[in-house]
Amino acid sequence: MMDWKRSFADTKVRDVYDLIVKEPSKVQRSAKIMDVIDQMLMNPTSRKVYVIDVEGNLIGVVNTEMILRLIGYRVGVKENSSMAFVHFLKDTLKEDVEDIMILKVRPVKRETPLTEALKSMIEFHVNDLPVVDDDHKLIGELMSSELFIAAKRLFESP
């Protein structure tokens, strides 16, 4: 009988990271928010658009939560508080990706153990991780769904 717990522990990011998302959504640093929305619409399984420089190096990320918040501000869906109004003033006029991208990105590499990627997802409350090569160029995206595929046998009845 196969030891699935051991099998999962031996799995690397390279074994699963492209099962669902074949090509990560990405834009250049100079892109507009509209470009991010277009990328999200073209790749609806992904919840992020990665920001890269001209060499393809990962420099940031824009997630769906940020875009939804900006949409909410533009259509008037907001909380009734002074902090919400401050956020509204701060965010509503933004048009450039550089203004909204998150700089703290925690990438993994193809050789990263899947257990390490899982630990990062849990610790940093993220569902997806960018996959980069040794030169920090974006080559893929590891989605939580891909971890589910690899771990599903852990929950099967004996």
What are the residue ranges of the model-derived segments?
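Tandem CBS (Cystathionine beta-synthase) repeat/Bateman regulatory domains
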Residues: 1-158
